[in-house]
């Protein structure tokens, strides 16, 4: 039978128009990593070409490495193969067809010439994606880190999303910094099989429910959209179909039908820089078998996972069939958002290590929930906990909703895709990504010990720190606490507004080591002593819960405010023994129960600091210093002199002290002892009072303009407004 000549077309730079026909003996040229398409014409008719004819090409690269690449039936008498390689040089191929008697398909030989890539598309310039060496992130083949910021477009191959709309949405997401689109090419979620909603401009993808008869025209239209994403530098994460009970692709087509479908997807899109998501809301032995078939069929070894109900890793029966753990953490509002991070951390802790990322969480605007503050919380909370990336979603966009047709069997939202495209969360996540990309973010590791509970921290020791402080409520301007700053490493700090992207400079910060000792313990003559022996308590007055003298102790319960009445002065030093299992405080400059200084140790925070109480309000902790493990009995020494006050603590083995801090209460008052609310009971002993005279020490680092993070703890200035903030500390070169 007459056979037409072999036609070849190179999809250089993803131009949709093919190159002109090339003679069979010639080798077409394609640039590295860019697909080349080769078309074969069958020499004889085949009654069921998609079901009965399998065509593969065995390519051998210049190094002699063979690679089996599946081809796909393109309609009529045509079969096509798409091939790409990072290896420069001449690649030879030979066809291998199940119809061995068809000389147009079987035993054909040829070659492709791969030349260096000269374009600017990062997906081609840096090469295919892979798991990074740290097993926590993704990178290109050349080692360039890949930041996964995904968007959810489950149904955007359907005809409700017009070609013009697809281009508009792609341009918007590219401009905002998105790098991945999760898109279904198979049975859709939230609709029945073979409904009209499934169609694109060329109809449905299959003509039979077992996927034995394909509609090549459908995939021709889909090709243009997949190619357009890649041309924009966006990786298509292709979902092979949905697996939930009400829209179960496995039940629809059977495992053999799903396997045929996946071979077809690999043949069409394997040469592109794609990611495989085997099934949506899928799992169990059958989907694991499909994932194994994908692994064995795909010659390019693309990254693969499952979109799960909860965790991809826990959804498969063999972890070897996936490369990373994709999570779905649930929809809703703040309860779902705050619950997402513990779920992420649990997945991150599983061994052996693999990249973990949230692939579905609270869609923005979904049933009128999960607006931008929720989106920012999940983004920053997961990224600073070790995530390989995040996939965002917006109402309207994921289901390709248009006015009058939301594209859903059960309507969650009537939001159109244009409205969802403009939700502010997508812009704000893009701003966060751009900030992280200004630093070696792929080397960041989570460091929760760098900040207080409720905030998130990550970075590189002695180089850069990121701290995300979620919104604490209205009228709360308190900034986060930075802990464990390295000794003598100068940092530059700034607040980053994750909403607007504005920066607020905080200047330089340094940990010069332990704070200089603010005063010498008991360096003045005694004015008063009390060892609490006997029952005479006439020198004292209880302004809180009653105190009791017994066996050399002054004991009190929560709310204890016991004041020495007879001595009034502004510059005094008090030393007293106490137990370390409850709060212990020394009162200075007491004027009333609502107006005094207190220098205290608290076992709940394991820290010492001062409060300048005024008008019944405590104000911010002053001079807070962490205290290591200490013995059961401690001695506190507190002093106030002029505009400064400080506290020293010792257990006989080790000593800790605050810096001298400036206080607003500078007038003469009385002294006493204190237990507010931590611990059931405190027993004070050996009370000593003397005059005090000291000033803040002059010694310090050469960089006198830097904020002092004594002993490694930095209490940041108030945030510019009560919302969530990102604090960045970047080390300064000498």
Residue ranges and their predicted role:
Residues 117, 122-324, 328-335:
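Active-site mouth of glycoside hydrolases
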Residues 555-614:
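Secretory/extracellular carbohydrate-interaction modules
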Residues 236, 532, 574-576, 629-660:
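Carbohydrate-binding surfaces in secreted/extracellular proteins
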Residues 260, 274, 279-419:
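Extracellular glycoside hydrolase catalytic/binding regions
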Residues 58, 65-133:
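Extended acidic/polar, glycine-enriched regions
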Residues 657-683, 697-713, 718-720, 728:
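Flexible glycan-contacting loops in extracellular carbohydrate-active proteins
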């Amino acid at each position: 039978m007459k056979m037409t000549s072999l036609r070849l077309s190179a999809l250089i730079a993803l131009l949709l128009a093919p190159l002109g026909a090339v003679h069979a003996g010639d080798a077409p040229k394609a640039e590295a990593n860019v697909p080349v398409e080769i078309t074969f014409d069958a020499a004889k008719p085949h009654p069921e070409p998609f079901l009965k004819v399998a065509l593969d090409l065995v390519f051998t690269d210049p190094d002699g490495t063979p690679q089996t690449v599946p081809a796909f039936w393109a309609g009529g008498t045509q079969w096509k193969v798409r091939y790409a390689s990072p290896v420069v040089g001449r690649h030879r191929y030979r066809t291998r067809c199940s119809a061995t008697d068809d000389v147009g398909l079987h035993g054909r030989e040829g070659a492709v010439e791969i030349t260096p890539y000269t374009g600017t598309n990062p997906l081609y310039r840096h090469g295919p994606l892979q798991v990074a060496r740290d097993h926590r992130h993704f990178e290109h083949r050349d080692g360039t880190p890949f930041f996964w910021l995904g968007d959810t477009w489950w149904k955007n191959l359907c005809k409700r999303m017009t070609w013009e709309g697809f281009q508009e949405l792609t341009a918007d997401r590219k401009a905002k910094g998105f790098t991945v689109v999760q898109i279904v090419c198979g049975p859709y979620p939230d609709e029945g099989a073979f409904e009209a909603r499934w169609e694109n401009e060329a109809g449905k993808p299959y003509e039979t429910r077992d996927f034995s008869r394909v509609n090549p025209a459908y995939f021709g239209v889909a090709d243009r959209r997949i190619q357009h994403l890649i041309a924009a530098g966006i990786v298509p994460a292709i979902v092979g179909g949905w697996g939930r009970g009400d829209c179960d692709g496995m039940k629809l087509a059977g495992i053999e039908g799903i396997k045929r479908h996946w071979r077809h997807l690999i043949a069409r899109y394997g040469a592109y820089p794609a990611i495989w998501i085997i099934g949506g809301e899928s799992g169990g032995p059958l989907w694991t078998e499909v994932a194994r078939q994908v692994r064995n069929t795909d010659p390019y070894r693309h990254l693969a996972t499952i979109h799960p109900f909860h965790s991809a890793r826990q959804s498969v029966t063999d972890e070897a069939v996936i490369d990373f753990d994709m999570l779905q953490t649930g929809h809703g509002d703040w309860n779902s958002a705050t619950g997402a991070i513990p779920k992420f951390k649990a997945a991150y802790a599983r061994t052996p290590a693999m990249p973990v990322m949230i692939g579905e969480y609270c869609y923005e605007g979904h049933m009128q929930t999960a607006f931008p503050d929720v989106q920012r919380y999940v983004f920053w909370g997961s990224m600073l906990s070790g995530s390989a990336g995040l996939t965002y979603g917006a109402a309207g966009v994921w289901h390709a909703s248009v006015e009058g047709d939301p594209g859903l069997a059960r309507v969650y939202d009537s939001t159109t895709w244009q409205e969802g495209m403009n939700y502010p969360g997508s812009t704000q996540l893009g701003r966060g990504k751009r900030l992280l990309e200004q630093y070696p973010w792929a080397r960041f590791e989570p460091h929760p010990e760098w900040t207080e509970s409720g905030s998130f921290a990550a970075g590189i020791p002695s180089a850069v720190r990121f701290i995300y402080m979620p919104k604490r409520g209205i009228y709360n301007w308190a900034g986060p606490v930075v802990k464990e700053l390295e000794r003598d490493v100068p940092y530059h700090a700034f607040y980053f507004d994750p909403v607007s992207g504005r920066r607020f400079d905080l200047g330089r910060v340094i940990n010069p080591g332990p704070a200089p000792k603010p005063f010498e313990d008991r360096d003045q003559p005694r004015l008063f002593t009390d060892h609490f022996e006997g029952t005479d308590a006439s020198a004292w007055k209880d302004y809180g819960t009653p105190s009791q003298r017994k066996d050399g102790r002054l004991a009190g319960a929560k709310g204890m405010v016991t004041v020495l009445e007879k001595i009034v002065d502004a510059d005094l030093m008090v030393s007293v023994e106490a137990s370390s299992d409850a709060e212990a405080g020394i009162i200075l400059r007491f004027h009333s129960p609502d107006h005094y200084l207190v220098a205290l140790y608290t076992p709940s925070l394991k820290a010492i600091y001062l409060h300048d109480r005024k008008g019944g309000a405590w104000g911010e902790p002053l001079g807070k210093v962490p205290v290591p493990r200490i013995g059961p009995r401690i001695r506190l020494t507190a002093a106030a002199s002029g505009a400064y006050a400080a506290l020293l603590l010792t257990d006989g083995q080790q000593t800790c002290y605050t810096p001298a801090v400036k206080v607003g209460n500078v007038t003469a008052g009385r002294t006493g002892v204190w237990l507010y609310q931590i611990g059931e009971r405190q027993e004070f002993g050996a009370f000593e009072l003397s005059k005090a005279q000291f000033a803040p020490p002059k010694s310090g680092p050469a960089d006198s303009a830097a904020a002092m993070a004594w002993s490694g703890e930095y209490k940041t200035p108030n945030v510019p407004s009560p919302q969530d903030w990102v604090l960045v500390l970047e080390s300064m070169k000498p």
